[in-house]
């Protein structure tokens, strides 16, 4: 049985059909990235998977007992509110100290445990959100534009950490990204979504798809060059 299986999913918001006839499977241990233009339904699909939105049609089948960790697109905290990373990790319910330490270590922010959240850099804050998602040792880790606002080095470091988490936990990773070079470097499969799934497959197969090229305004040479350039660098950039 697949870790996650979605079939014939339709979801409307405010009378507007946002997702139509979406089919998707996800296996344990793989990294899958969803790409698409703004308003294409990417975040809506993630919210339907975590149960925050209810589809009008179709089904979402999850492996029995599956645990999901979710890193949101953004989390706004009052900068004037004193809060350490350790305290944030204990909200909304307290966790044993050893669980918090393990999650912070997996996310690469052990040294920030006593830091004020307001003093963290953008990359450090995203890693803290990742640590919160890892507290439950998830079978499926979902990331919604988790590198938004980070520079190139920050993105590379963050996704290197995701690769390590995948290997340590054996979890599946489902992420949304607008960064095509991240998609080609970090993913086992890519899904192009624009209300419906336009194309899906390995990065190389998607890069050769007319639907993918049309979606991002790429010609054949640009799309394949994007794949080959970043795929050839992946073993260096994603290594410890």
Swiss-Prot record:
It is an enzyme of class 7 (translocase). GO terms for molecular function: ABC-type zinc transporter activity; ATP binding; ATP hydrolysis activity. Its EC number is 7.2.2.20. Its main location: membrane. ATP binds at residues 36-43. GO terms for biological process: response to zinc ion. Pfam families: ABC_tran. It is found in: Cell inner membrane. It comes from the Bacteria. Residues 1-219 form the ABC transporter domain. It catalyses: Zn(2+)(out) + ATP(in) + H2O(in) = Zn(2+)(in) + ADP(in) + phosphate(in) + H(+)(in). One of its GO terms (cellular component) is plasma membrane. The keyword Transport applies. It is a peripheral membrane protein. Keywords: ATP-binding, Cell inner membrane, Cell membrane, Ion transport, Membrane, Nucleotide-binding, Translocase, Transport, Zinc, Zinc transport. PANTHER family: METAL TRANSPORT SYSTEM ATP-BINDING PROTEIN TM_0124-RELATED, ZINC IMPORT ATP-BINDING PROTEIN ZNUC. The complex is composed of two ATP-binding proteins (ZnuC), two transmembrane proteins (ZnuB) and a solute-binding protein (ZnuA). Belongs to the ABC transporter superfamily. Zinc importer (TC 3.A.1.15.5) family. Part of the ABC transporter complex ZnuABC involved in zinc import. Responsible for energy coupling to the transport system. This is Zinc import ATP-binding protein ZnuC.
């Amino acid at each position: 049985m697949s870790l996650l299986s979605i079939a014939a999913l339709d979801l409307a918001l405010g009378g507007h059909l946002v997702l139509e006839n979406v089919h998707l499977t996800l296996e344990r241990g793989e990294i899958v990235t969803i790409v698409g233009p703004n308003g294409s339904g990417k975040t809506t699909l993630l919210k339907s998977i975590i149960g925050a939105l209810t589809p009008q049609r179709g089904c979402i089948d999850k492996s029995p007992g599956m645990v999901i960790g979710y890193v949101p697109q953004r989390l706004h905290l009052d900068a004037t509110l004193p809060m350490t990373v350790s305290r944030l990790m204990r909200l909304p319910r307290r966790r044993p100290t050893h669980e918090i330490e393990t999650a912070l270590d997996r996310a690469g922010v052990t040294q920030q445990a006593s830091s004020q959240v307001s003093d963290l850099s953008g990359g450090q804050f995203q890693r803290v959100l990742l640590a919160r998602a890892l507290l439950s040792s998830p079978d499926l880790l979902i990331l919604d534009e988790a590198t938004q606002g980070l520079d190139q080095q920050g993105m590379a470091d963050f996704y290197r950490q995701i690769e390590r988490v995948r290997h340590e936990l054996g979890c599946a990773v489902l992420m949304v990204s607008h960064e095509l070079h991240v998609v080609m470097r970090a993913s086992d499969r890519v899904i192009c979504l624009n209300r419906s799934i336009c194309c899906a497959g390995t990065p190389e197969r998607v890069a050769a798809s007319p639907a993918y090229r049309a979606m991002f305004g790429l010609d054949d040479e640009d799309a394949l060059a994007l794949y080959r350039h970043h795929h050839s660098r992946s073993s260096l950039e994603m290594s410890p």
